[in-house]
Amino acid sequence: MGAAPLTPGWQAERTPDAPAIIMGATGETVTYAELEDRSSRLARVLRARGLSEGDTIAICMENNRAYLEIAWAAQRSGLRYTAINSHLRPAEVQYMLDDCGAVAFFSSAAMADEVARLDLSVIPVLVSAEGDLTAFERYADLLAGAAPGPLGDEREGREMLYSSGTTGRPKGVRKQLPGTPFGDPASAPVIVPREPNGKLYKRLLRERYWAGHRSLVT
């Protein structure tokens, strides 16, 4: 049986070497095959660390290739994922981490000064996606040590985003999880398929915009 329609795996079966993510600043690309492999491996890591359907991860870092890999890992694991603007003050980041109940936190060496001012003692899984951070595991090492292939019981996750806080503190929007298998067409975010002629379509992901970044996936 192939991957569910309009998921990274589905597109990887058709155009594995086509770019799924293109970094606007550098031109760096992540292919559909890489996105499928890396998000699947991370999903396995998170499951092995005890995360289960309904748990929340948080991401706060600059725009980099790992950001959407992490989001897709959560999406296919039945997890909520909270994208936190990397330009917020540490106190604001701390509030969102505490409020969303994150049990895994992804950041990067570029955020070292801000991360050093956070209390992360209650978050069991800390991962640096780019570079080294004290007390954080390295993203590349986790992926290298994980088995390939998707989990056998993938479930739909979803984003947990925050309002801008213009009338007070930002408010988390904790929507109910779909409770459906990953790729269920009624509830899943979709990848716009490539046309047979190879024409690219660009999609702006909501969680990236609201986190103070923009990412285009083809």
Predicted regions and their residues:
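A short N-terminal helical cap/helix-turn-helix that marks the beginning
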Residues: M1-I21, S215-V217
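Structural core segment of the AMP-binding/adenylate-forming
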Residues: P8, R44, A48-R49, W72, ...
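AMP-binding (ANL) adenylation modules
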Residues: W10-R14, R49, E62-R65, A186, ...
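Conserved pre-ATP/AMP-binding loop-to-beta segment of ANL
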Residues: P16-D17, A144-S164, G168-R169, F182, ...
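Conserved AMP-binding/adenylate-forming core of the ANL superfamily
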Residues: A20-N64, L68-A71, R89-Q94
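Conserved AMP-binding A3 loop
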Residues: T29-A33, R158-P185, K202
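Conserved S/T- and glycine-rich ATP-binding loop of Class I adenylate-forming
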Residues: I57, A74, F105, S163-T166, ...
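AMP-binding adenylation
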Residues: A186-A188, V192-T218
